[in-house]
Structures are given as C-alpha cells and as structure tokens.
Amino acid sequence: MVPVSLGCAMQSPWQLVSGGVTSPQGFQASGIAAGLKPSGKLDMALLLAPEQAVCAGSFTTSVVRAACVDLCAERLAANGGQARAVLINSGQANACTGDRGLIDSQRATQALADQLGLDAEALLICSTGVIGVPIPMPKLLAGLDPLVAALSATGGEAAATAILTTDLVSKQVALEAELGGRRVRIGGIAKGSGMIHPDMATMLGFFSCDAGLDPSIWKAMVGQAVQRSFNAITVDGDTSTNDTVLAFAAGDPLDSVHHAALEQGLTEAMQHLAKAIARDGEGATCLIEVQVEGALDEPSAQRVARTIVGSSLVKTAVHGRDPNWGRIVAAAGRSGVPFDPEQVALWIGPHQLMQSGQPLSFDPEAASRVLRSETVQIRIQLGDGPGNGLAWGCDLSDQYVRINADYTT
C-alpha cells in the first residue's frame, strides 16, 4: 500500500486497515497472469460482489471511448444500478478497435457469466493498455477458469497488481469505521500513472463497501467522492479513452443518519488512491498538493487548484526547486475563475510569498528546501468567499519524456 496521508479537513471516524478491496465483508477478488502482457506479469483481475450489490460508475468524458466503457454504462443504467462483478484486463485498451471491441467485451462477460453462474448483464468489464490493440481473446478466455478458481477474500493485492500498466507500484486502500453500532468497511484498488487529468483520465478505480444502500443514494455518493478525488488530480493533462471508477456496495442496510459519514469515508478512500496515482506519475519525484481558499464556491476553488497543479511551468518549477510564485499566480489567473488579484495571498509550505496581491520578502533558499519535500504544499487565498478546493499532481521531469518516448500509448 502506498503511504499517502488522507488529509481530511474535519475529524474523521475512518481508520486505515489492511485488506484492500476485499476488506469489506463478502467481497472476493483475484489476479492472474493470462499471457496478455508480453512480460508475463499479472494481467487479468476479477472483483466479485455479494448478492444484491448495487454499483455506481463514473466514466471518461472523452468522446473517443473504449467499447467496455459504453458497455458498463449501459448495463448499469439497464439494471437500475445493480451489478455483481467486474473483469479487468491489462495490456490492451481495446479502444478504437471497431465492432470487434464491443463483440469481444460481450464475449468476455458472457464466458465469465457461464463460469460464475450469473447473468451476463450483471457483469462489467474494463480494459487498460495500448489504444488500438484488441484483446487477445483466446488467452483471455483460457484465463477465466483459473481466474475464477483464484477468487478469495484475500485476493485484493493480486487484483491490485494485475490491473497495472506503467505504474511503479500497486495502489490499494481499506478504511473502517463504527457506524450505527456496527463495523463498516470501504476498500479500493486503482491504477494510473500517466495520461492523468481531471474529468477521469487514464485511470481505473474499483471500490467495495459492506453497507446496504439504495442505488440512487449510492450513485450520488460516488459522484461527489469522484469529483473531490479522481477529478482533482493531473499528471500530464492528457485524458484517456478507458478511465472508469466502479463502486460496489452490499450488506445490511445503513440508516440514513450515517450516510454523510459513509460518503466522507468513500471520499477519503478515493482521495487516498487519487493522491497515490499523482505521486506515482511517470517520472515524478514528488506529490504537489494545491489548496485554494476564499473562492466564490467549491467548484471555482477546485478549478483554480486544478489549473495550478496542471501547469507545466508550475510543475517544472517544483522539479527545479524554484519558488517561482509568479507561475502559480499566472496559472490561477488563466483558470477562468473571477477573483480580485489585489486580495491574493500565497504560501509554499509555511513560507508566505504574497499578501494583498503584492510579493513579500522571503528566504528563497528556505522555500526551495520545501520544494525538495516528498509532498509539496501550495496554498493560495483568493479572497474571503466560502469556496475551498484541493487538487493533486506531481512535478514534471525529463524522465517523463523518456518514459513516454519509449512506451506506446
């Protein structure tokens, strides 16, 4: 598990525990090497939810979408927000593959349904890898039997590894809280390293929860949590064809008085993995966290934060350990969010660099040392409005260029 702080503003009842996506009661997962990757690494994963599970999804905003994305969205809509499992293959995006892409996704879920004894319409599929490359179906189909056989309540780690592409590390999380006199758990796994940008980009995230909820309530919770996590990260500003978040919930009903706490836990879990993705950005040496305060509203604050953390000039300044506050303010100014420049205050770590829109005297060497941290915190105050927002990214290094010059997307 990547050690990323949850960074919650309010007191949280949620605590980190072990177990990842199979930590919640009743969930099983597996990950195997089916030969989809030339490297021989794990490349196929399965997450199975208990009966009566509800599921909510969030999908890429790109108009160029893999067939599996549309299949997931259509099945969730047709089933009223219910699903039992998701199959994930790594190595081939199965995007821009014509009619074959949809046919292969349907064949894969039907074959898996036969293995599990379930209706194919209750199964989802996600693919990640090289765009334009179809799934090698004979290998995938041959891998279903051992994949199902490997399902277990301890299979979350194997699943977390099997979904990776250019990631340096696997990413998983599990949280636990006492709600209504009983233990509730939330688990998750994710992948993503490059082509990460707000509005869900080249990343996959899968979550589980052992509380029973109405599908519409769960869908609203997932939407809010995604907006404050995966839609608040950027590595390189590129958006993908396959990015998907799927969140399953199944268990004893949870009283509505605890729904806010559950949404808080789901947000914390997603933020944990979102920051892990940003920290694992291709060629990255640090995580950048931008906090915006005093905006007109939360969406405005988030937009400014995302613009700053996505600025190539800001990212390269951080990599060069250069406390160049002008790049930060300039990025905020082009965000499209109205604010009064004469009210701006700016901090890098504990060092205040601006007040009332004017530069302050500061120790550049001390500020530069802050930029050498594993997590670089930038805070900007736009005014006295109620809107606050967070976004995460990473620095931009020459290693990023080398990685993407050598790897076919």
UniProtKB/Swiss-Prot annotation:
The organism's place on the tree of life at top rank: Bacteria
Site (Involved in the stabilization of negative charge on the oxyanion by the formation of the oxyanion hole): T128, G129
Location in or out of the cell: Cytoplasm
InterPro entries: Arg_biosynth_ArgJ, ArgJ-like_dom_sf, ArgJ_beta_C
Site positions (Cleavage): A201, T202
Pathway terms, separated by semicolons: Amino-acid biosynthesis; L-arginine biosynthesis; L-ornithine and N-acetyl-L-glutamate from L-glutamate and N(2)-acetyl-L-ornithine (cyclic): step 1/1; Amino-acid biosynthesis; L-arginine biosynthesis; N(2)-acetyl-L-ornithine from L-glutamate: step 1/4
EC number(s) on file: 2.3.1.35, 2.3.1.1
An annotated Gene Ontology molecular function: L-glutamate N-acetyltransferase activity
A GO BP entry: L-arginine biosynthetic process
Sequence positions that bind substrate: T165, K191, T202, E282, N404, T409
UniProt keyword terms in alphabetical order: Acyltransferase, Amino-acid biosynthesis, Arginine biosynthesis, Autocatalytic cleavage, Cytoplasm, Multifunctional enzyme, Transferase
Function of the molecule: Catalyzes two activities which are involved in the cyclic version of arginine biosynthesis: the synthesis of N-acetylglutamate from glutamate and acetyl-CoA as the acetyl donor, and of ornithine by transacetylation between N(2)-acetylornithine and glutamate.
Quaternary structure and partners: Heterotetramer of two alpha and two beta chains.
Family: Belongs to the ArgJ family.
Entry protein name: Arginine biosynthesis bifunctional protein ArgJ
Native species: Parasynechococcus marenigrum (strain WH8102)
